[in-house]
Amino acid sequence: MPFTLGQRWISDTESELGLGTVVAMDARTVTLLFPATGENRLYARSDSPVTRVMFNPGDTITSHEGWQLQIDEVKEENGLLAYTGTRLDTEETAVTLREVLLDSKLVFSKPQDRLFAGQIDRMDRFALRYRARKFQSEQYRMPWSGLRGQRTSLIPHQLNIAHDVGRRHAPRVLLADEVGLGKTIEAGMILHQQLLSGAAERVLIIVPETLQHQWLVEMLRRFNLRFALFDDERYTEAQHDAYNPFETEQLVICSLDFARRNKQRLEHLCDAQWDLLVVDEAHHLVWSEDAPSREYMAIEQLAERVPGVLLLTATPEQLGMESHFARLRLLDPSRFHDFEQFVEEQKNYRPVADAVAMLLAGNKLSNEELNMLGDLIGEQDIEPLLQTANSDRDGAQNARQELVSMLMDRHGTSRVLFRNTRNGVKGFPKRELHTIKLPLPTQYQTAIKVSGIMGARKSAEDRARDMLYPEQIYQEFEGDSGTWWNFDPRVEWLMGHLTSHRSQKVLVICAKAATALQLEQVLREREGIRAAVFHEGMSIIERDRAAAWFSEEDSGAQVLLCSEIGSEGRNFQFASNLVMFDLPFNPDLLEQRIGRLDRIGQAHDIQIHVPYLEKTAQSVLVRWYHEGLDAFEHTCPTGRAIYDTVYHDLIAYLATPENTDGFDALIKTCREQHEALKAQLEQGRDRLLEIHSNGGEKAQALAESIEEQDDDTSLIAFAMNLFDIVGINQDDRGENLIVLTPSDHMLVPDFPGLPEDGCTITFERDVALSREDAQFVTWEHPLIRNGLDLILSGDTGSSTISLLKNKALPVGTLLVELVYVVEAQAPKHLQLNRFLPPTPVRMLLDKNGNNLAAQVEFETFNRQLSAVNRHTGSKLVNAVQQDVHAILQLGEAQAEKSARALIDAARSEADEKLSAELSRLEALRAVNPNIRDDELAAIDSNRQQVMESLDQANWRLDALRLIVVTHQ
């Protein structure tokens, strides 16, 4: 190679050294100094792995003093280059910069610069970059983006609500599905969509204290959302890091009590600029016009400051119209300001519900009914649609559906309230109760008697709680020497049941963690029964492992022993046998226990086994739950209300179970109240609201579309390719499970989303639902999203050289494959990617500028190519550099044409969709006051900003591959 002192070269193998300068040479070697790092390198003069750095007219270069020069002319004298052009900071022309004075920290970012500087990537990285661009663009445009990545079953009514609400600007809604229908999942789906699209960045979740960990686990396990749990200790710690402790985290969970208890803390919460507020168990927010509770006022303060609000409640409005109004008032105080007016409005919705029922029944409508429909819809030119709906012609069904949609858009609280009931949703199993009456051991009788004498001063409630758990009373007296499990008949029954049903998975729930741990030891030591334990003293990872062991079909645990608190938020639908070793204190906890198995999607009827000891509080409670509330075999929305009504009487019977006088009458009273309340609920069901919340065929089609996407294998192929190139080890464990671990030769030392000790992943939704230790990998999973960012935000794969062995073409024929990206810059909340995500435009040009890309598909072409090592590649580039420059100029003109077409199409689509949505809501605003002014203003503002951003869209060369034809 012809070296001269002062020339600038770059290392092919250590490009991070920057620009090198020739400082010494002899007949056989050359020494380069790399000023950016202060290092020297000694190379052989012949065949050294370095590339001469030469710039061309039109390029912009930087001097060692920091100013930039746009090159007009390049001169060579005695082997050294001098660049003449315009200095950009002073606009001085005819400025000369000698190559020895170039900035040594020079970074080549353009693909063509990297190619000419010898920074040549491996061929497989170029292919990965193009695939990443293509797949990313496709995923951004998916209409159900944000709904596929969660570890949940594809349940239509949940998807319908999430799809509707998740795309709104700052949604303010009340989610009031019945228990077991998945409100937490719906809220999580909405959050996931809003965070993924950039519509929201800061989220606050406020829940009762007992549900904090359940939400923390649910958000992480199902949605890969890492929330920070704030309590007194965390709040104090965070005060050292920021004036407002809540600004130290983007996603926060705290309890309602924590938020309400301290005035300064509430002020900090209100000032923390959240985008979304989620409040669970919102029916506990007590309100009356004269005396709202402190809890209600705290949430009211937050709701006034936070743009988006999701309230979750399982209590239907019929059990308290005033509290229902209070919750709606939090969402839109200007709309729901007068309780009396609200009650009157609700009465007026009955004709609308009747009209919907008529349309859905498919019966012919009378003229009177047609007139009523016309009046309710209030649209001009509605007559033809009404006539079609009332005929036998094609399209009658579609016309009826359109009329139903119009009615639902215009009336009721359907935009702010969503409520699904078990009656309206299919897919729930039956519940069958098996009670097992067992004798009370003499040891317990003695312990209870002594406890009664010693605890005479205890409150009735404390005595009642003690009487529910006789093993605890006995153990307190006996201490460490007590072995209640040796004589408690429930233990014998449980062992017998498990040994005679070895093939069945059984979930056992008891009130205390200590009971679960003792039972595990007994089952293991006496019968060799494989039992996993699950309690609040375990970490989330330990609970995951226990749940995973229980879920394994062949070698897994037969039984999972859970404490009351430990089982919160976990669902085990693959099991259908539930044993309640004891009974919980109130109906809500009973429903929560059964709800671990009784979920939508459960494939089998649920067998509920309740072994109880006669003459104890257990025998009282089992009768009250079953005969008084029918709470074992059916969900019991009335349970809490009746429990509160008869609380003192019930406590008295539980505290003194031997006293049964009047208990039958109490059960009869409770049953009558239960039936009356149930009838009241059924009569007051808002069919219109249920139809809207359920989503019908539209929701079913959405679920099927996502299921189809789940079956697409392109993600698996891409992910494996990505993991290989990034340097992540993959170990196939069978059963559709893969273990990923970091390797010593990764592209980055710490791959975001991959733990140091690795993780187990699956691409199968069913496997992910049964194996909580496995992460469910989709296009929306952090591993894939971070992988795409890693490849596309840097220059990985942006320049490469390949050989094409093809005897039909002359040796040395040049082809250049160009990948341009058309993109627009805009704030994330505008969700510009719906219309114009970063979109790749691929071209395959010959020397004359003919584009062969349409005839030569990428993957087919890629398989025909072979790699070139970097050193040989640099030589090839130097030989054909002028030709490549010429082809690049031809490509630029073609890229502009393609880019303009994409941008114009995106503008048309954005204008059409956003204008249509704005027009629809403006028209509805006249007849439905539930459409907020700020929502209309936001859509209008968004439309203008989106159009402005698309006007400024641009394109750039993202990757380049030089292909040389060979016959060898």
Swiss-Prot record:
GO annotation terms (biological process): regulation of DNA-templated transcription
Record SUPFAM superfamilies: P-loop containing nucleoside triphosphate hydrolases
InterPro entries documented for this protein: Helicase_ATP-bd, Helicase_C-like, Helicase_RapA, P-loop_NTPase, RapA_C, SNF2-like_sf, SNF2/RAD54-like_C, SNF2_N
Keywords: Activator, ATP-binding, DNA-binding, Helicase, Hydrolase, Nucleotide-binding, Transcription, Transcription regulation
Positions occupied by motif DEAH box: 280-283
Binding positions (ATP): D177, E178, V179, G180, L181, G182, K183, T184
Helicase C-terminal domain ranges (all copies): 490-644
GO molecular function: ATP binding; DNA binding; helicase activity; hydrolase activity, acting on acid anhydrides
EC number: 3.6.4.-
Residues that span the membrane, as ranges: none
Residues covered by the Helicase ATP-binding domain: 164-334
Family: Belongs to the SNF2/RAD54 helicase family. RapA subfamily.
Database matches in PANTHER family: DNA ANNEALING HELICASE AND ENDONUCLEASE ZRANB3 FAMILY MEMBER, SWI_SNF-RELATED MATRIX-ASSOCIATED ACTIN-DEPENDENT REGULATOR OF CHROMATIN SUBFAMILY A-LIKE PROTEIN 1
Job of this protein: Transcription regulator that activates transcription by stimulating RNA polymerase (RNAP) recycling in case of stress conditions such as supercoiled DNA or high salt concentrations. Probably acts by releasing the RNAP, when it is trapped or immobilized on tightly supercoiled DNA. Does not activate transcription on linear DNA. Probably not involved in DNA repair.
Family annotation (NCBIfam families): PRK04914.1 (NF003426)
The protein, known as: RNA polymerase-associated protein RapA
